[in-house]
Swiss-Prot record:
Belongs to the universal ribosomal protein uL24 family. This is Large ribosomal subunit protein uL24. It comes from Finegoldia magna (strain ATCC 29328 / DSM 20472 / WAL 2508) (Peptostreptococcus magnus). One of its GO terms (biological process) is translation. Part of the 50S ribosomal subunit. SMART domains: KOW. CDD domains: KOW_RPL26. Signal peptide: none annotated.
């Protein structure tokens, strides 16, 4: 999976199409990512005896990695990623302009 924690991505399909956000968590085995401010769901929280209150909680749910693209801030659009070797190290790069990603 070429998307990593901390990457800025844009949603390319679904109810949140066009929104951008940072990747909070990558679920590699499920091929999903959790993006900040995207795919917000309402969870019904049940109270327990240890001080956790009941109520409705809004939180981000995972979204399939095929529905997001890496966001290129310079060009203000999504781009595909690839891997290449520079100085013996494997680095990610944007396929649209061949810039490496730190």
């Amino acid at each position: 999976m070429k998307i990593k924690n901390g990457d800025t991505v844009i949603v390319i399909s679904g109810k949140d199409k066009g929104k951008t956000g940072n990747v909070i968590e990558v679920l590699a085995k499920k091929n999903k990512v959790v993006v900040e401010g995207v795919n917000i769901v309402t969870k019904h929280q049940k109270a327990n005896g240890r001080g956790v209150e009941s109520g409705l909680i809004k939180k981000e749910a995972p979204i399939d990695v095929s529905n997001v693209m890496y966001y290129d801030a310079k060009n203000k659009k999504g781009t595909r990623l690839g891997y290449k070797f520079e100085d013996g190290k494997k680095v990610r790069f944007m396929k649209s302009n061949n810039e490496t990603i730190k």
